């Protein structure tokens, strides 16, 4: 089956499954029919490389399966030395309904990393408004991950200059394996003035390799979110949410961010997002005006049994400074998924 056909089939299957199936109850179909699972952990990285761990869409763990969330971050702590895990990237939808009990579960899981592995977070649509409805920009994120705790950490670089005491839009720097990295974490559907600030950050750090994390950027058909071109044919575009209507469409999707931010600089090396259902996976590579190829990656496991089955993504940056190994591993299943969408080697453009 061709890749696009496979995705269409998966999308149709997920569309007809009841929610209880997605959360691991009453399943009658094989949830890993599209996978290639093998037992064990990824091979240990070679000396001189480093790893970033990616946690997408933990909303179901925060709501219903907190033990899985705890198992993920504990595995990262237990593995960070032998794998040289330099940081953890959370891609948003930290919670499902923006409720205190869910934030408490998320806080408990992420706090296991404190003092061991730095972590960087961006909010998703479910982290906003009462019930996670994303009707406005209100969120409990700052109640449980307050700026006062993060601004003194050595990796912290700064926050959106109009909201210096809030965590929705931040950047962080890492020096690892003789490389200078900058993680730029932006809110769901970033506001235009947030993008203005992000441009200033990218300009200020021209020698840093920038990784953008934001909740919605590319879609599961391997294209960027583009409201003007696709409209509602790409589900869950930030422009389609109540917050857009409430703010005179002051939101940016993936195409907006490419045109207004990434394409204006030659130091972005990678984008990462979650958010999208269907098969929850995607990859899109496009060139900047300077001819540099920038991989854009979608990863989301929330449709798997038990809210995600513990899957996380490991990005191993090779010492050649040109390639990155991608592994999907579940600490709770103690398995790898080595299908073509889950295990790959990507080329990264230097700066």
Identify the residue ranges that each predicted region occupies.
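Extended active-site neighborhood of metal-dependent phosphoesterases/phosphodiesterases
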Residues: 30-37, 100-197, 204-209, 237, ...
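Residue-level marker for buried hydrophobic side chains located in beta-strands
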Residues: 52-54, 88-90, 121, 212, ...
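Active-site environment of divalent metal-dependent phosphoester hydrolases
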Residues: 61-63, 96-99, 123-132, 167, ...
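Conserved beta-sheet core of the metallophosphoesterase superfamily
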Residues: 121, 237-242, 246-316
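N-terminal secretory signal peptides and thylakoid transit peptides that target proteins
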Residues: 1-17
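A short C-terminal boundary segment appended to hydrolase-like catalytic domains
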Residues: 46, 306-351
């Amino acid at each position: 089956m061709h890749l696009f056909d496979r995705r269409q089939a998966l999308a149709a299957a997920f569309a007809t499954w009841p929610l209880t199936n997605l959360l691991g109850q009453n399943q009658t179909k094989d949830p890993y029919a599209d996978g290639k699972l093998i037992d064990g952990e990824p091979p240990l990285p070679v000396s001189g490389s480093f790893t970033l761990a990616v946690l997408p869409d933990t909303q179901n763990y925060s709501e219903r399966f907190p033990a899985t969330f705890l198992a993920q971050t504990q595995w990262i702590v237990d593995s960070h030395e032998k794998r040289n895990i330099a940081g953890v990237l959370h891609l948003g939808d930290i919670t499902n309904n923006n409720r205190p009990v869910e934030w408490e579960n998320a806080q408990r899981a992420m706090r296991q990393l404190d003092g061991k592995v730095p972590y960087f977070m961006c909010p998703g649509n479910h982290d906003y408004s009462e019930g996670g409805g994303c009707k406005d920009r209100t969120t409990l994120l700052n109640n449980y991950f307050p700026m006062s705790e993060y601004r003194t950490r050595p990796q912290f670089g700064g926050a959106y200059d109009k909201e210096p005491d809030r965590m929705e839009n931040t950047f962080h720097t890492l020096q690892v394996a003789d490389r200078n990295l900058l993680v730029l974490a932006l809110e769901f559907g970033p506001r235009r003035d947030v993008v203005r600030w992000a441009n200033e950050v990218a300009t200020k750090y021209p020698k840093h390799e920038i990784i953008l994390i934001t909740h919605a950027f590319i879609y599961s058909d391997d294209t960027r979110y583009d409201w003007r071109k696709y409209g509602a044919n790409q589900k869950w575009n930030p422009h389609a949410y109540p917050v857009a209507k409430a703010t005179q469409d002051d939101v940016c999707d993936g195409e907006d961010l490419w045109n207004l931010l990434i394409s204006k600089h030659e130091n972005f090396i990678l984008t990462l997002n979650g958010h999208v259902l269907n098969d929850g996976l995607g990859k899109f590579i496009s060139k900047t005006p300077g001819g540099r190829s920038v991989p854009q990656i979608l990863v989301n496991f929330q449709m798997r049994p038990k809210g995600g089955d513990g899957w996380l993504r490991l990005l191993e940056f090779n010492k050649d400074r040109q390639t990155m190994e991608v592994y999907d591993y579940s600490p709770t299943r103690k398995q790898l998924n080595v299908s073509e969408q889950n295990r790959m080697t990507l080329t990264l453009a230097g700066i």
